[in-house]
Each structure stands twice: as structure tokens, then as C-alpha cells.
């Protein structure tokens, strides 16, 4: 279910960024946060790799950077969940924002390794900071929605098996 939703999201996002319809919010990071929080870590890591490679299908870049950045994002979520209260709203916002910021910084650092002509780093950093904050705020609304969907699916499965 998460993979289908994420592939649809990545497709819509790539089309909307080309047409500049809406601001970019990374729902894949929010799904990874949810999977680490409520499911197994191995599911979250596999999801991160699959979504990274599917995102690379729609972009032109160096193969493997996006999955690696999602894996680092997963590690940031796992480590920061030990220090922050991820059940509270500020903890969720800060954890998802840290993960998104780390993911984007790793992505930019790898691009800078291969292309040294990126001069507007400060303006990119401001954009990434705003994107990370918006993704963290949006995660507060999406996580309860995912919890409710998961609860409804579990109830449906238990009713069908009985």
C-alpha cells in the first residue's frame, strides 16, 4: 500500500515541479518515519531503498545518491528518536525536519563532489531549511491519517479472517 501511494506521489510531484504547481513536500520521509515508529526497521529501510530508486527513474542524476540519502534519513530518524520525544508534536516536527534536512544536505554534498560549479549554496540552504520545516509540519497531519488507515486495514483483515 505504501509503495503504491509513494509511486503515485513521486509521479505527481515530478509533474507538478515541472509545472511549478505546489511547494515540494517529501512524503517519502514521512512514510519512513511512520514505518520506523510503528513497523519494523527493516521494512522502513527496504521502503527507503525502493522509493529512492523509483525517484531516480524520474530524475537525471548519479545512480544511487537518492537511495543513499533516504537511508541516511532513516538513520537520522532512528538516532533522533532515541533523544527526542517522538510522540509529541514538537518531537515529530523536529525529527522529520532533521531527517529531511540531512537527506537534502547529503544529496547536495554528493552533487558538489561531482560538480564544483554550484555557487548559490546559501540560497539553496534557505530553501532546504524551509522545505524541511514544512515537511515536518505536514508530518503532524499525515502520521495520524496513516495510523487510522492502518487501524482500519487491520480491522478489515481480522473481520475477513474470522
Where are these regions (language model features)?
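Terminal, non-globular segments
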Residues: 1-162
Amino acid at each position: 500500500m505504501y509503495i503504491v501511494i509513494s509511486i503515485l506521489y513521486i509521479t505527481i510531484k515530478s509533474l507538478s515541479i515541472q509545472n511549478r504547481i505546489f511547494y515540494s513536500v517529501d512524503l517519502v520521509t514521512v512514510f519512513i518515519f511512520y514505518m520506523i515508529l510503528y513497523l519494523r526497521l527493516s521494512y522502513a529501510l527496504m521502503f527507503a531503498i525502493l522509493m529512492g530508486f523509483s525517484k531516480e527513474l524520474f530524475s537525471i542524476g548519479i545512480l544511487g545518491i537518492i537511495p543513499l540519502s533516504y537511508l541516511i534519513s532513516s538513520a537520522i530518524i532512528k538516532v533522533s528518536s532515541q533523544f527526542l520525544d517522538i510522540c509529541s508534536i514538537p518531537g515529530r516536527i523536529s525529527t522529520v525536519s532533521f531527517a529531511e534536512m540531512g537527506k537534502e544536505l547529503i544529496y547536495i554534498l554528493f552533487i558538489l563532489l561531482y560538480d564544483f560549479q554550484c555557487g548559490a549554496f546559501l540560497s539553496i540552504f534557505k530553501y532546504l531549511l524551509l522545505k524541511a520545516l514544512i515537511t515536518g509540519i505536514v508530518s503532524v497531519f499525515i502520521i495520524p491519517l496513516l495510523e487510522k488507515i492502518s487501524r482500519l486495514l487491520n480491522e478489515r483483515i481480522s473481520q475477513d479472517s474470522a
